[in-house]
């Protein structure tokens, strides 16, 4: 999985960015999304507030904003078209590869790590996996959805080695 890391704050270490990249690649393998692409942007509370308002209509900062990429209209080609035109087939693979982007507030990550009594690394990993699952269709609007998403999220974090301790 290709993951573009963007640090708008200048405060996220290369080591942390690498850990988030590895964690998201691990999560992608767990749910069968290895051949996808996404972006992760680290921001402050002011910027995440702007993004939250612009894309979700919610006028406050949050910890992570997940923007799932959904083409406005489905592009459908006949199988023969793709077999006859390798360039078109490659273009369609690339088009289908991009799944979305995350905006993670490092301010909220620090606050929540302290509030929940675990490390900043654990909170950053939690937010990255939580957002990643959202852009892959998981949600928590109903108790059933919440149990599935949070269970998978905890399974990924624990298997990767990011526990609450």
Curated annotation (Swiss-Prot):
Keywords (A to Z) from UniProt: Cytoplasm, Endonuclease, Hydrolase, Metal-binding, Nuclease, Ribosome biogenesis, rRNA processing, Zinc
Domain of life where this protein originates: Bacteria
Pfam families: YbeY
Cofactor(s) recorded in Swiss-Prot or TrEMBL: Zn(2+)
Compartments, as annotated in UniProt: Cytoplasm
Keyword check for Aminoacyl-tRNA synthetase: no
Gene Ontology biological process: rRNA processing
Main location (coarse class): cytoplasm
Chain residues that bind Zn(2+): 130, 134, 140
InterPro entries: MetalPrtase_cat_dom_sf_prd, YbeY, YbeY_CS
Assigned GO CC terms: cytoplasm
Entry EC number(s): 3.1.-.-
Cofactor detail note: Binds 1 zinc ion.
GO molecular function: metalloendopeptidase activity; RNA endonuclease activity; zinc ion binding
Matching NCBIfam families: rRNA maturation RNase YbeY
Classification via PANTHER family: ENDORIBONUCLEASE YBEY, CHLOROPLASTIC
Function: Single strand-specific metallo-endoribonuclease involved in late-stage 70S ribosome quality control and in maturation of the 3' terminus of the 16S rRNA.
Similarity comment text for this entry: Belongs to the endoribonuclease YbeY family.
UniProt-recorded name of the protein: Endoribonuclease YbeY
Protein species of origin: Streptococcus suis (strain 05ZYH33)
